[in-house]
Amino acid sequence: MSSRVTLHPGREKSLLRRHPWIFASAIESTKGRMNLGDTVDVYSHEDVWLGRGAYSPHSQIQVRIWTFTQNESVDNGFFQRRIARAQQSREELIERHGLTGYRLIAAESDGLPGVTIDVYANVIVCQLLSAGADKHREKIVWALKAQFPEHGIYERSDVAVRKKEGLEEITQVLAGDIPDEVIIEENGVKIIVNVKQGHKTGFYLDQRDNRAIAAQYAKDRDVLNCFCYTGTFGSYALAAGACSVTSLDVSDLALETAKRNVDINQLDSSKCEFINHDVFQALRDYKAQSKQFSQIILDPPKFVDSKASLNRACRGYKDINMLAMQIMAPGGILATFSCSGLMPFDLFQKVVADAALDAGREVQIIQRLSQAPDHPVSTNYPEGFYLKGLICKVL
């Protein structure tokens, strides 16, 4: 007999809408031997089968659903089908844009809760962030090898959220030879990706379309790229004809890579300045110096990691947008982003509006932006929508 979870009366509604999470408070009882990451069957209080998922007793989300099909086993074939489907759904995008770097698996949105997989040329980088994903590591690697027999596979599960699942952080080679760096190309721009030490899996693929959109406004402008990481917004801007690009970050490694990205794209490095400085303080310093820019990119790290921190995050977003608006030349373009899934788009837009009031500037929103299409959002899992951005004209 399989292990099973029975829900409290009425708590099956989200599963009937095929949402993949079951919180601890929804569980009435469990039956059978259930270890971390084990596959369990989920039943309603009325004993109706609802789904099959991974058990995680240490997490608030105690079951993450693998499948809503009762006769589908969670075996090698299951992961092979999911990965093949995800690759097929991205083929048109890959071919249309000539991508060599893309997100292959976007966790719950691709039917694999807790699994993030990015492809960088001939290297695959995966993050296994849930108990179920960790439990099925060998099956996932087997499926990846079947789909990509020539690729190296590297695990970057060095993420604090694993501790909530009762798991340790880990990085390791899973297959093949893994170089420290890989070069990918998107929209004609080459990008150095450090798969072993870079942020996340090495790079922010979700901003691909937004980099191209921001670059459309860069010609003949002086661009300030805040939280620049490896400088790709800046490389795009230079390629589009920017007069100058000033890149700010607090990582020497990121700034050095940003310089190298300029060089490998054969762009004019004399137009570039790379500064290791806290962005908030740098913006205040520019204001004190009466220095202005005609395009500013604000792509900060996640400010919101819990609902309790949302108000504090709003203050941070407002302050940084206000400071940017205060040093913007008339008619300048602000590209501002939030990668915090807990920040609603309407609230983010309100925060930017409040920043404009405090800055004493008239501001127009001319585009609303989101994550690239290889980061899809399942209609059953709206939490998959996290990246939001605004292109604003500061009058």
Curated annotation (Swiss-Prot):
Record Pfam families: Methyltrans_SAM, PUA_3
Catalysed reaction, written as an equation: cytidine(1962) in 23S rRNA + S-adenosyl-L-methionine = 5-methylcytidine(1962) in 23S rRNA + S-adenosyl-L-homocysteine + H(+)
Name of the molecule in the record: Ribosomal RNA large subunit methyltransferase I
EC nos: 2.1.1.191
Enzyme class: transferase
Cellular location(s): Cytoplasm
Keyword field: Cytoplasm, Methyltransferase, RNA-binding, rRNA processing, S-adenosyl-L-methionine, Transferase
Its biological purpose: Specifically methylates the cytosine at position 1962 (m5C1962) of 23S rRNA.
GO CC annotations on file: cytoplasm
Keyword Cytoplasm tagged: yes
Gene: rlmI
Record domain PUA: where: 2-79
